[in-house]
Swiss-Prot record:
Organism: Mus musculus (Mouse)
Protein name: Semaphorin-3A
Ig-like C2-type domain residues: 579-665
Glycosylation sites: 53, 125, 591
Gene encoding the protein: Sema3a
Compartments it resides in: Secreted
PROSITE patterns listed in its UniProt record: IG_LIKE, SEMA
Molecular function via GO: chemorepellent activity; neuropilin binding; semaphorin receptor binding
Length: 772
């Protein structure tokens, strides 16, 4: 099948898809969409594509002081330079052959499970890290020396000191783990058995006896999947500090009709050492509450996003009240969506001070507890702030008994403004990770979210107030593909010092800058329309915004994105012959079809077309119909007529600002003139055309005939029939082709001659019809 006919058939399929999708709105799309190739060509991504004998780059630890990113993977621990991850050190930490064979004999996959997958990577002190891995279903931990100072350049495993990793790392590499190391003590949420059924929140290491949640009690934990753990002060007294765990779990019996997943936040006191007679070596201050992330639906039925995927804490001036960002997805296999919800710690504390969930038996519903709550209130840390108890071992028996039977709160925690700040339901991906950066802009502070997806893309989103700062709308600035192949993003870290973002997946690690101001354009209006808090117009280019720069030359409007007000160069916006205007000349054949391509850089811009007849100054808006069809890629003109000759102006309209992107001059050649040029047997150019046609190979003549047939049959409704005829003829020719019966020597000679022929060929007659 010829080149042109193949392209024509492909174009027909793309055209139908484009026509169907054009009616969709542009409000929920990224303003800029950058492919992996575009990211590479613009030097906006650096990738570490992994090692042949490693994978699963899921466990991140950021060290801004040393300018290193530590990454735990399969059988390896890496130390990447934050400036450029191409510069790295590695530690090889595999399991022994004996452990691997035991894992294999237990029925596990020798490649995907019988290895040492690093699950815990925490800073132990100023000179060492603490690392734990699955150890081929035999968890193991050790220390890694990193030196006192960054210039020490030390990164080595202490292979003389290994510890049992039970209660620190899961056995199964597929299970999630949340860990936090404080004052030499490791807090971890994980599974503590080979079968992956005994889930618990542990505290190990240190000088105290290990402590955990109650075992085999679904009221405490019901098949949880741990996401993250964070230390948050409760007051100015360090004795009141609490560790909060974020996880998702199956709903408790009676809490929901049918099987459901709930997102949770759990709390424990840092100075909890268990009970004296009851709950010995068990948490006595553990409480949990449900996190709600939902949107109102018809008939009062809300759509819930219950699958908690990731959590990020944005610190504020008050360390006791960080903002909690959570990424959620739906549990349904039919309706797939993602959401980001934002929570305040004051709302969390209010719920933990509210009523406890209670029911009298298995056949009863959960209700708020109405009886007397013992003193001190269960969940309160023993300190001088809230009572005279020095230790949880001194708590009265009724407090311990109540805490054991009432670990859940009745009221849930609702997000700020009672709704998500971002929802995505009409895309082929789901959110997996989130990090947030607080950026100072000309008109205030903005939180910029970087959201990872399960297809290897990163979304850059900024929340902008509509009327007040309490009523926010999200603006999707960019969608960036950061890996060559689609892969789930499983880890993200943000370096404010380096202004870089680091992304982990099964395939490798990627690094990209937080801002790419130069890609927005070379005009003030384009920079202003981007609404990127990192960027501002400095008088000559779109560059990084610095609050300390001279205010006189800066142009930035994140809240409204209004270039008409802020840019002084807009007096030239109606000059169609400006330096940024692209001009093209296209030739079309009468009664055939042609396509005028025009795609603005911004996917949020609306395209507006005008037509200017030859030798006329007046421009008129192009009206769509059967003759002219608009797609997202441009204009399709069917059955060209001589009157279609003229200038076509493509404008992009965004936020009330119109910019001319392209001027296309269309010249329509009448059919009689073309036939005369192509088939004329007279001397001159006609003889040259005839000579060219006679010198064509049979396959080239078929291609030429297909082209003429397309010209003489411009009705695109028969395009699929035409393509089917070409494909049938091509298959028939392949079936009728004689078999090759030559010997190996003749075959080799034929290949050599063919190769020489290809090298001498100029390809002059294989060009597309337009170039001919």
């Amino acid at each position: 099948m010829g080149w042109f006919t193949g392209i024509a058939c492909l174009f027909w399929g793309v055209l139908l898809t484009a026509r169907a999708n054009y009616a969709n709105g542009k409000n929920n799309v990224p303003r800029l969409k950058l492919s992996y190739k575009e990211m590479l060509e613009s030097n906006n991504v650096i990738t570490f594509n992994g090692l042949a004998n490693s994978s699963s780059y899921h466990t991140f630890l950021l060290d801004e002081e040393r300018s290193r990113l530590y990454v735990g993977a399969k059988d390896h621990i890496f130390s990447f330079n934050l400036v450029n991850i191409k510069d790295f050190q590695k530690i090889v930490w595999p399991v022994s052959y004996t452990r691997r064979d035991e894992c294999k004999w237990a029925g596990k996959d020798i490649l995907k499970e019988c290895a040492n997958f690093i699950k815990v990577l925490e800073a132990y002190n100023q000179t060492h890290l603490y690392a734990c891995g699955t150890g081929a279903f035999h968890p193991i931990c050790t220390y890694i020396e990193v030196g006192h100072h960054p210039e020490d350049n030390i990164f080595k495993l202490q292979d003389s000191h290994f510890e049992n990793g039970r209660g620190k790392s899961p056995y199964d590499p597929k299970l999630l783990t949340a860990s936090l190391l404080i004052d030499g003590e490791l807090y971890s949420g994980t599974a503590a058995d080979f079968m992956g059924r005994d889930f618990a929140i542990f505290r190990t290491l240190g000088h105290h006896h290990p402590i955990r949640t109650e075992q085999h009690d679904s009221r405490w934990l019901n098949d949880p999947r741990f996401i993250s753990a964070h230390l948050i002060p409760e007051s100015d007294n360090p004795e009141d500090d609490k560790v909060y765990f974020f996880f998702r779990e199956n709903a408790i019996d009676g809490e929901h009709s049918g099987k459901a997943t709930h997102a949770r936040i759990g709390q424990i006191c840092k100075n909890d050492f268990g009970g004296h007679r009851s709950l010995v070596n068990k948490w006595t201050t553990f409480l949990k509450a449900r996190l709600i992330c939902s949107v109102p639906g018809p008939n009062g039925i809300d759509t819930h996003f219950d699958e908690l995927q990731d959590v990020f804490l944005m610190n504020s001036k008050d360390p006791k009240n960080p903002i909690v960002y959570g990424v959620f997805t739906t549990s349904s296999n039919i309706f797939k969506g993602s959401a980001v919800c934002m929570y305040s710690m004051s709302d969390v504390r209010r719920v933990f001070l509210g009523p406890y969930a209670h029911r009298d038996g298995p056949n009863y519903q959960w209700v708020p507890y109405q009886g007397r709550v013992p003193y001190p209130r269960p969940g309160t840390c023993p300190s001088k702030t809230f009572g005279g108890f020095d230790s949880t071992k001194d708590l009265p028996d009724d407090v311990i008994t109540f805490a054991r039977s009432h670990p859940a709160m009745y009221n849930p925690v609702f997000p700020i403004n009672n709704r998500p700040i971002m929802i995505k339901t009409d895309v082929n991906y789901q959110f997996t990770q989130i990090v947030v950066d607080r950026v100072d802009a000309e008109d205030g502070q903005y939180d910029v979210m970087f959201i990872g997806t399960d297809v290897g893309t990163v979304l850059k989103v900024v929340s902008v107030p509509k009327e007040t700062w309490h009523d926010l709308e999200e603006i999707l600035l960019e969608e960036m593909t950061v890996f060559r192949e689609p892969t789930t993003i499983s880890a993200m870290e943000l370096s404010t010092k380096q202004q870089q973002l680091y992304i982990g997946s099964t395939a490798g690690v990627a690094q990209l800058p937080l801002h790419r101001c130069d890609i927005y354009g070379k005009a003030c209006a384009e920079c202003c329309l981007a609404r990127d808090p990192y960027c501002a117009w400095d008088g000559s280019s779109c560059s990084r915004y610095f609050p300390t720069a001279k205010r006189r030359t800066r142009r930035q409007d994140i809240r409204n994105g209004d270039p008409l007000t802020h840019c002084s160069d807009l007096q030239h916006h109606d000059n169609h012959h400006g330096p940024s205007l692209e001009e093209r000349i296209i030739y079309g054949v009468e009664n055939s079809s042609t396509f005028l391509e025009c795609s603005p850089k911004s996917q949020r811009a609306l395209v507006y077309w005008q037509f200017q007849r030859r030798n006329e100054d007046r421009k008129e808006e192009i009206r769509m119909g059967d003759h002219i069809i608009r797609t997202e890629q441009g204009l399709l003109l069917r059955s060209l007529q001589k009157k279609d000759s003229g200038n076509y102006l493509c404008h992009a309209v965004e936020h009330g600002f119109m910019q001319t992107l392209l001027k296309v001059t269309l010249e329509v050649i009448d059919t009689e003139h073309l036939e005369e040029l192509l088939h004329k047997d007279d001397d001159g150019d006609g003889s040259k055309i005839k000579e060219m046609s006679s010198s064509m190979t049979p396959s080239q003549k078929v291609w030429y005939r297909d082209f003429m047939q397309l010209i003489n049959h411009p009705n695109l409704n028969t395009m699929d029939e035409f393509c089917e005829q070409v494909w049938k003829r091509d298959r028939k020719q392949r079936r009728q082709r004689p078999g090759h019966s030559q010997g190996s020597s003749n075959k080799w000679k034929h290949m050599q001659e063919s190769k020489k022929g290809r090298n001498r060929r100029t390809h002059e007659f294989e060009r597309a019809p337009r170039s001919v």
